[in-house]
Amino acid sequence: MARLHSLVFLGVLASVPAPSLAQSTQPTPSPTSEASSGSEWSIKPRGRIQVDVADINAPATVAGDNFGTEAEIRRAYLGVDGTLPGNLGFRVEADFAGEFADESVQFTDVYLTYKPTDELTLTLGQHKPFFGLEEQTSDLFTSMLERAAFTSAFGFERRIGLSGAYSRGDLLVQAGAFTVHTADLDADDDSYGFDGRVVFSPKLGVGELHIGGSAHLRELKGSDAGTVRYRARPFAHTTDTRLVDTGSIAANGERSFGAELAYIAGPFHATLEGHRITALRPGLPNSSFWGGYAEVGMLLTPGDKTGYRGGTYDRIRPADPVTEGGIGAVQVNARYDRLDLNDGAITGGLQQTLGLGVVWVPVDSLRFQANYGRLWISDAAIPAGTDRDYRVDTLGVRAQFDF
């Protein structure tokens, strides 16, 4: 069955016309299917594939799997966007990457939208709660191969829920109530939560300022009741080993807050983001952990601008793509990332990362990335012999295509 799903995905992907170097980089009109004489019915295929190769160089005495050089299909999405009469829209999309590793296909976005006004959008189904700037930014447009360590450590994921987003001028307000991921529907998981985010993005000088904050409250029920766990990979996804890990913590809920600050001016961007999560522990002192990152980046190619729209980073569109005899867009980025999983008697470890990256975008739909990371691990969950303080180096590259 896994092989069948993989062949279906590859067959559909192969049917999508590849961008020719002789073609313009202007988007091709979306294929539509119309009912009767109206134009409100439409359907548009969408997808992406990301292929990663990463090398993780950890001390030889650290016990872990898939260190050294490994390759993986990081994401292989296939789905459709559509519109319906009455200001309705929908998206159905699944990730087939697991099929290449004998795992299951998982739904990503599966939702229905309704726009009663130009400013308000209501969404019902599985989509992202509003955790913060980098988590809301599509993985197609992130500056590093992997998002900040806290986004995975704190369990940020898509969930089934009902939300609303109000956007007017420089203000964006998002809020919703969410349950669980579709993969957990059969796991007797009755957890639910409430998430909200506010972004103010006024013009400032020659650029745009981004100021945001988010708040989250989650009640753990069913199979998730009683424990939480926070852990993170070492700046690469090719291993399942986490060098920082709190282990299971008795808790019946979570409360967290995030803060976002960014400035985008032409080819330049700077970002500062942090998130603090508290495990709510009945009869015991609550435990709090936090993570954050600071980043600067610059597009080196003339005429190129950092993409930003709707409270998130967006696609880089080369001013001089290879289809017109240029070299595309080249961006360099530097980041400091910190994840602290120590609090009181709980010692999950401290992971600090200095990341350097380069992004090459030859045309809108193609992207190549390379990252180097130097990690400093303190109080590691997995020691190097008897030493719980050590360093790790990672190097990763990605080839990406989307339509």
Show which residues each predicted segment covers.
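Outer-membrane beta-barrel pore domains
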Residues: 25, 38, 57, 64-65, ...
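C-terminal intrinsically disordered extensions
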Residues: 1, 199-203, 212, 220, ...
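Outer membrane beta-barrel
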Residues: 27-58, 63-221, 261, 293-324, ...
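Hydrophobic helical h-region of N-terminal Sec-dependent signal peptides
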Residues: 9-13
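N-terminal signal peptide c-region/cleavage motif recognized by signal peptidases
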Residues: 17-18
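Bacterial N-terminal signal peptides that target proteins for export
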Residues: 1-8
